[in-house]
């Protein structure tokens, strides 16, 4: 049996893959693959409308928010967000992981040519991002603030800002990169001005990025590039140009699957159960360590851990691969191991990994 612990692209629900296989050559008796039908066709309009409706239901997205299906990966949002929201203002960033730093660095680069200021509220980089940044609200100029940017789940480092720990910044829009825990943890969308997520972790396949934006934040000026303008993209129903049709279709199937599993709250409970099995073993062991400083900040999507040495880490990864545990090697910047156990990852795979970890410890301690 193969278990895919990849951080993204990652495991997809078997039911979704079977549905794709079933419809691949003939979508809804059209005689064409969904990859072949026009994005302007009635058939595809129904696909994108249903996907949008199901996502709105799953996340309880208020009606004053637009849902956009975009290209370019979540990293493109590092540029689009300040371009659309920050002109003439101050853009604040809380940096608790590598992707948060990338978002900030991109804003700094843009601020050299565009009229806004990119401001870091601090970083935990010097501690290897082993904990989340404590945000000092007094450093935020509310009158001039365009937004505060956070990353809800740090895929590489294995930390999460859970809903109860979201920063409260009054009227300042909260912007969140939710790429690795959207639909895996239940957040109140109304607390955010904008949410974005690459699809290849919990939503589907690479090539699609979801943006959920409050309508009052849509850019009112026409000076931006049309392809980078949320307002134009929203006005055109995510089809200003040809969208990633197959990725949208597949995400729509994932949304249906999430509903069939009982919704986000139900999956979050299952994800917590899966993560707890691994963290319990790590905490009870003198062999394995979690690099995350605070237990309350541990991710339930990306469980990061190490053994007593880099040599044992390498041996663990080798033996794990031989056992069918794929892509469990930690990110190159961190090392160790990382078990990404997103929504579609089966609980049986976690049980098998726990068994393997115990055996490996006995053989190598």
UniProtKB/Swiss-Prot annotation:
Q: Which SUPFAM superfamilies match?
A: PLP-dependent transferases (SSF53383)
Matching Gene3D superfamilies = Aspartate Aminotransferase, domain 1 (3.90.1150.10), Type I PLP-dependent aspartate aminotransferase-like (Major domain) (3.40.640.10)
Q: Known InterPro entries for this protein?
A: Aminotrans_V_dom (IPR000192), Aminotrans_V_PyrdxlP_BS (IPR020578), Pser_aminoTfrase (IPR022278), PyrdxlP-dep_Trfase (IPR015424), PyrdxlP-dep_Trfase_major (IPR015421), PyrdxlP-dep_Trfase_small (IPR015422)
What keywords sit in the KW lines? Amino-acid biosynthesis, Aminotransferase, Cytoplasm, Pyridoxal phosphate, Serine biosynthesis, Transferase
* Localization annotation: Cytoplasm
N6-(pyridoxal phosphate)lysine modification sites are 201
Q: Does the keyword Transmembrane helix apply?
A: no
Q: Which cofactor does it need?
A: pyridoxal 5'-phosphate
**In which broad location class does this protein mainly occur, judging by the first location in its UniProt entry?**
cytoplasm
Biological process terms in GO annotation: L-serine biosynthetic process
Q: Name one GO cellular component term.
A: cytoplasm
Spell out the reaction equation it catalyses. O-phospho-L-serine + 2-oxoglutarate = 3-phosphooxypyruvate + L-glutamate; 4-(phosphooxy)-L-threonine + 2-oxoglutarate = (R)-3-hydroxy-2-oxo-4-phosphooxybutanoate + L-glutamate
| Binding of pyridoxal 5'-phosphate, residues | 74-75, 99, 155, 177, 200, 241-242
Instruction: State a single Gene Ontology molecular function.
Output: O-phospho-L-serine:2-oxoglutarate aminotransferase activity
Q: How is the cofactor bound?
A: Binds 1 pyridoxal phosphate per subunit.
Q: Where does L-glutamate bind?
A: 40
Tell me its EC number(s), please. Answer: 2.6.1.52
Its annotated pathway reads: Amino-acid biosynthesis; L-serine biosynthesis; L-serine from 3-phospho-D-glycerate: step 2/3
Record's family?
A: Belongs to the class-V pyridoxal-phosphate-dependent aminotransferase family. SerC subfamily.
Under the subunit heading, UniProt states:
Homodimer.
According to its UniProt entry, the function of this protein is described as: Catalyzes the reversible conversion of 3-phosphohydroxypyruvate to phosphoserine and of 3-hydroxy-2-oxo-4-phosphonooxybutanoate to phosphohydroxythreonine.
Spell out the protein name for this chain: Phosphoserine aminotransferase
Point out the gene that encodes the protein.
serC
């Amino acid at each position: 049996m193969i278990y895919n612990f990849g951080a993204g692209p990652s495991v997809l629900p078997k039911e979704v893959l079977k549905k794709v296989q079933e419809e691949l050559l003939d979508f809804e008796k059209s005689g064409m693959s969904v990859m072949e039908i026009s994005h302007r066709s009635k058939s595809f309009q129904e696909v994108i409308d249903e996907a949008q409706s199901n996502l709105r239901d799953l996340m309880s997205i208020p009606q004053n928010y637009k849902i956009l299906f975009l290209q370019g990966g979540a990293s493109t949002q590092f540029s689009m967000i300040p371009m659309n929201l920050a002109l003439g203002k101050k853009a604040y960033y809380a940096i608790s992981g590598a992707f948060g730093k990338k978002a900030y660095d991109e804003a700094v680069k843009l601020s050299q040519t565009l009229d806004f200021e990119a401001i870091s509220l601090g970083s935990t980089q010097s501690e290897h991002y082993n904990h989340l940044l404590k945000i000092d609200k007094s450093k935020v100029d509310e009158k001039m603030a365009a937004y505060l940017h956070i990353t809800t789940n740090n895929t590489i480092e294995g930390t999460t800002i859970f809903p109860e720990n979201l920063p409260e910044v009054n009227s300042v829009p909260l912007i969140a990169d939710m790429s690795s825990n959207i639909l895996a943890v239940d957040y109140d969308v109304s607390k955010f001005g904008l949410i974005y997520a690459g699809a290849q972790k919990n939503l589907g396949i690479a090539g699609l990025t979801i943006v959920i934006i409050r309508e009052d934040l849509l850019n009112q000026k026409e000076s931006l590039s049309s392809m980078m303008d949320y307002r134009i993209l929203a006005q055109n129903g995510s089809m200003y140009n040809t969208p990633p049709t197959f990725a949208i279709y597949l995400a729509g199937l994932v949304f249906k699957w999430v509903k069939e599993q009982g919704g986000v709250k139900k999956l979050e409970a299952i994800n917590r159960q899966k993560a707890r099995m691994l963290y319990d073993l790590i905490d009870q062991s003198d062999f394995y360590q979690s690099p995350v400083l605070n237990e309350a900040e541990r991710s339930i999507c990306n469980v990061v851990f190490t053994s007593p040495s880099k040599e044992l880490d390498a041996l663990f990864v080798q033996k794990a691969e031989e056992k069918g545990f794929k892509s469990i090697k930690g990110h190159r910047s961190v090392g160790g191991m990382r078990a990404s156990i997103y929504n579609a990852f089966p609980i049986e795979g976690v049980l098998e990994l726990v068994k393997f970890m115990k055996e490996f410890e006995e053989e190598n301690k």
